[in-house]
Curated annotation (Swiss-Prot):
The glycine cleavage system is composed of four proteins: P, T, L and H. Belongs to the GcvP family. Pfam families: GcvP2_C (PF21478), GDC-P (PF02347). The gene is gcvP. Keywords: Oxidoreductase, Pyridoxal phosphate. GO terms for cellular component: cytosol; glycine cleavage complex. It comes from Rhizobium leguminosarum bv. trifolii (strain WSM2304). Its EC number is 1.4.4.2. It catalyses: N(6)-[(R)-lipoyl]-L-lysyl-[glycine-cleavage complex H protein] + glycine + H(+) = N(6)-[(R)-S(8)-aminomethyldihydrolipoyl]-L-lysyl-[glycine-cleavage complex H protein] + CO2. This is Glycine dehydrogenase (decarboxylating). The lineage of its organism: Bacteria, Pseudomonadati, Pseudomonadota, Alphaproteobacteria, Hyphomicrobiales.
Length: 954
């Protein structure tokens, strides 16, 4: 028994987030791991890994790290500085009700938000089905043939539509027409995209200003930003006669009541699915949609889910037509986009599944009736309301009373839209209550009640929808919440996410997404703020963003940041535009050559071509380093026109190259700028700063280094940091500073997920972030050391170390045992692991990145699985296993394999419970190996017929 005199206070800190929650290995485990690698201390390992020339001089310091509770209190204090008013601003952003069953079971569920992009289809069947539902929903509502699995936002989708039009149009014109009734942010992004490519943008009234022979395409808003509903059928026919492409940007909820773009003859439809249950969140993230005619599906950007079969012939889903994506076609890709908005697309699809066609149509009708009632009240006050026919948006001529009425509305708790100097706009939505209408009437000087008016319709009779939509049974079978909950659970059980096991994907940084970091994103003070509210209503957001920028500057050594890019690829694009604008401002607009090493990520060359640059490829040496002689020769050869180089650091081969400063100096000496891709920043935070080693601009993947979850393939954030001389050329936005160059629909991109990164910084502190980097490097070197002998590690530094990831070579197994990298990846599924990154940056290899969040036990389990796979390959080499009928070739194994007739020359136990696999909580792949060739040859990108569901259940 302890006596009072024996009692001692402990120095153990149970709420130390960095060391007790975020970082996986304990101090004792780190000591053991260091011994395996051959070091006595963590600092010794770091000194042996990073070249001295790139080490930052001063430690990363900012205040004491907060506990989870302290950070949440700070976030609450900051959130309370935002004013949550009812916003009827519209302009593509609308109030919506997120069904609680979707909020709790998807948005707040790590089984959904911690998954990776579904490149491994066998362990992604749940997400893929949800995305197929999304594509079916979009195809039905737009009346078009093929939809992708979402894009970044509506404005980006419109710009991508323009790029498709230029690519596939028969017309040789170099101008694109934009309906003046498009949303301002859409027009801004189209201008940004067109200018460096030399395309003229004509903005005007399509019925008076459009001559189809002058353009390669045109985009129309439906309904328009000010409420007009036009029939574009005739204009579209004229465009087709001239060989031009038609695009309709359509409100997805309005399409339940209005004639679809496909029925008008449109080639492409784009829009946002935000109002299908996704909060506005000060601008995002939201899932944009794109649908196209079948003839142009191969030119569509982004990801496309299709139906295939597995090795048993059962239905299985996969990503289709991947050969058109940037990671394969590089500068010849349809787009640089490698991020969808999967989590948000899943939410939108589940909104449709939950409500069904009757429910969604009823919501649309109610929204329209509210808009009509609003118009009747304003007309009774003597105001002229436009247009005569509308869906949810009206515009009121108020003359010199505009400012007075806008202020009066704010006093009533309502934001209205300022339109020019004499008009006010308002868009009604699902959340609009009778009290809101009465508040607006009071702001206009009226004192009416809803009961004073009879509901009616003001939709154009000639454009009423008569075609069916959402006819597939999936949109009719989950009305009861019990069934909805089970359906969501069934889908999530088919997937492998971070809530089950480590996801060791190289260059992806699948680290912990802590629950405390995730909680604030659904607080109304963050989720219910319209992106275009007056600045004084978003003071909390601005304070948080400013502080996060200050911290990111401290981390990177840059002087300024733009938080606008809402993906890493968008960040690359924005950074290259910033460089281009810098050269133009200096009278050197002719500089258009971009040097890119062959090892670069596919987004790099794709982004360069999007800003009109010419890509010059630089060789890479056998050890993975950039060939300095070739780099020097090409920099000097193109000195007169050199715009920039794009490099990744640490390199895409997982090594800190020692010549990086020399490369930066070479570029600067020849008049160029250095773009350092921040994809691997998780190996640098607190140890090295891009801005100190010669880089001029970088994007950071907040969904990697700073803990925003991958969401199964989005959302992401790719803010760009720049040195001071580039700061004046960062992206502008029409709704904030009015400057050109917008790259995202909202000024701060996907702002509602920024609390995740901010709280991560608050809880880790500078010292904790630095420790996380060190442990990420430790974990990678531990795996590389443990696998040594079984697999070759392709690239190491002169000291024999890797950075935060390593590439192991599985190519020898092809010759010795007929085992491919795909076989290894699928066998890892049997062990309960997502495969590392396959065949990039070197074909036939695996890139492994464990991150700092994984415990030694999990690292050992993974190594045990990899070593066991090598032994299985050795058994094939020695003739102890058949070369064709073996656990590697037949992987992954399913429950159907386990209980079915067994005729294989190895045991069920060996098949289903290899080393590393859990016995009690084993993850079972829901399908056998998916047939990729079949899926592309028999392309089906909407929900299969109901009969196939019945067959699957048998």
């Amino acid at each position: 028994m302890t006596t009072p005199t024996e009692f001692q206070f402990t120095d153990y800190q149970p709420y130390d987030f960095a060391n007790r929650r975020h970082i996986g290995p304990s101090p004792a485990e780190m000591t053991d791991m260091l011994k395996v690698i051959g070091y006595n201390s963590l600092d010794g390992l770091i000194d042996g890994t990073l070249p001295p020339a790139i080490r930052q001089k001063a430690p990363l310091v900012w205040g004491a790290p907060m506990t989870e509770r302290e950070a949440l209190d700070k976030l609450r204090e900051t959130a309370n500085k935002n004013k949550v008013l009812v916003s009827l601003i519209g302009q593509g952003y609308h109030g919506t009700i997120t069904p609680p069953v979707i909020q709790r079971n998807i948005l707040e569920n790590p089984a959904w938000y911690t998954a990776y992009t579904p490149y491994q289809p066998e362990i992604s069947q749940g997400r893929l089905e949800a995305l197929l539902n999304y594509q079916t929903m979009v195809c039905d509502l737009t009346g078009l043939d093929v939809a992708n699995a979402s894009l970044l936002d509506e404005a980006t989708a419109a710009a991508e539509g323009m790029a498709i039009a230029e690519r596939v149009a028969k017309s040789k014109a170099k101008a694109f027409f934009v309906d003046a009734d498009c949303h301002p942010q859409t027009i801004a992004l189209i201008r940004t995209r067109a200018e460096p490519l030399g395309w003229q943008v004509i903005v005007g009234n399509p019925f008076t200003d459009l001559d189809p022979v002058d353009v390669f395409g045109a985009i129309f808003q439906y309904p328009g930003t000010h409420g007009h509903i036009n029939d574009f059928t005739g204009l579209i026919a004229r465009l087709h006669q001239a060989g031009a492409i038609s695009i309709v940007a359509a409100d997805i909820l309005a399409l339940t009541l209005l004639k679809s773009p496909g029925e008008m003859g449109a080639d492409i439809a784009v829009g946002s699915s935000q109002r299908f249950g996704v909060p506005v969140g000060y601008g995002g993230p939201h899932a944009a949609y794109m649908a196209v005619k079948d003839a142009i599906k191969r030119s569509m950007p982004g990801r496309l889910v299709g139906v295939s079969v597995d090795a048993r012939g059962n239905r299985a889903y996969r990503l289709s037509l991947q050969t058109r994506e940037q990671h394969i076609r590089r500068e010849k890709a349809t787009s640089n986009i490698c991020t969808a908005q999967v989590l948000l697309a899943v939410m939108a699809s589940m909104y449709a599944v939950f409500h069904g066609p009757k429910g969604i149509k009823a919501i649309a009708q109610q929204v329209h009736q509210k808009a009509v009632l609003m118009a009747k009240g304003l007309e009774k006050l003597g105001y002229k309301v436009e247009p005569e026919s509308f869906f949810d948006t009206i515009t009121v001529d108020v003359g010199h009373m505009q400012g007075l009425i806008l202020r009066a509305a704010v006093a009533e708790g309502v934001n209205l839209r300022k339109v020019g100097d004499t008009h006010i706009g308002m868009s009604l939505d699902e959340r609009t209550r009778p009290a809101t209408l009465e508040a607006v009437w009071r702001a206009f000087g009226g004192n009416f009640k809803i009961a004073d008016f009879e509901p009616s319709y003001r939709l154009p009779k000639g454009l009423l929808r008569t075609s069916d939509y959402l006819t597939h049974p999936i949109f009719h079978m989950n009305r009861a919440e019990s069934e909805m909950t089970r359906y969501i659970r069934r889908l999530s059980d088919r997937d492998l996410a971070l809530d089950r096991s480590m996801i060791p994907l190289g260059s992806c940084t699948m680290k912990l997404n802590a629950t405390a970091e995730m909680l604030p994103i659904t607080w109304p003070e963050f989720s219910d703020i319209h992106p275009f509210v007056p600045a004084d209503q978003a003071l909390g957001y601005r304070e948080m963003i400013d502080d996060l920028i200050e911290k990111l500057c401290a981390v990177t050594g840059y002087d300024a940041f733009s938080m606008q890019p809402n993906s890493g690829a968008q960040g690359e694009y924005a950074g290259l535009l910033t460089i281009r604008n810098f050269h133009i401002a200096n009278g050197e607009g002719h500089r258009d050559v971009c040097l890119i090493p062959t090892s670069a990520h596919g987004t790099n060359p794709a982004s360069a071509q999007m800003v009109g640059m010419k890509v010059v490829v630089v060789k890479v040496r056998e050890n993975g380093d950039i060939d300095l002689d070739d780099f020097r020769a090409k920099a000097e050869e193109h000195a007169a026109n050199l715009s920039c180089c794009m490099i990744t650091y640490p390199s895409t081969h997982g090594v800190f190259e020692e010549t990086v400063k020399e490369i930066c100096d070479l570029v600067h000496a020849n008049g160029g700028q250095v773009y350092l891709d921040g994809a691997n920043m998780n190996a640098m935070v607190g140890l090295s700063r891009p801005g100190d080693i010669g880089s001029d601009v970088s994007h950071l993947n907040l969904h990697k280094t700073f803990c925003i979850p991958h969401g199964g393939g989005g959302p992401g954030m790719g803010p760009i940091g720049v040195k001071a001389h580039l700061a004046p050329h960062l992206p502008g936005h029409p709704e904030t500073d009015g400057r050109p160059g917008a790259v995202s629909a909202a000024a701060f991109g996907s702002a509602s997920i920024l609390p995740i990164s901010w709280s991560y910084c608050l809880m880790m502190g500078g010292e904790g972030l630095t420790q996380a980097t060190k442990v990420a490097i430790l974990n990678a070197n531990y795996i590389a050391t443990r696998l040594k002998g079984a697999y070759d590690v392709l690239y190491k530094s002169k000291t024999g170390r890797v950075a935060h990831e390593c590439i192991i070579d599985t190519r020898p197994l092809v010759d010795s045992a007929g085992v491919t990298v795909d076989d290894v990846a699928k066998r890892l599924i049997d062990c309960g692991f997502h495969a590392p990154t396959m065949s990039w940056p070197v074909a036939g290899t695996l890139m492994i990145e464990p991150t700092e969040s994984e415990t030694k036990a999990e690292l050992d389990r993974f190594c045990e699985a990899m070593l066991a796979i090598r032994e299985e390959a050795r058994a094939i080499e020695d003739g102890r296993m058949d070369k064709v009928n073996n656990p590697l070739k037949n992987a992954p194994h399913t429950v159907e394999d386990l209980v079915g007739e067994w005729d294989r020359p190895y045991s069920r136990e060996q098949a289903c419970f290899p080393p590393g696999a859990f016995r009690v909580d084993k993850y079972w792949s829901p399908v056998n190996r998916v047939d990729n060739v079949y899926g592309d040859r028999n392309l089906i990108c909407t929900c299969p017929p109901v009969e196939s569901y019945a067959e699957a259940a048998e």
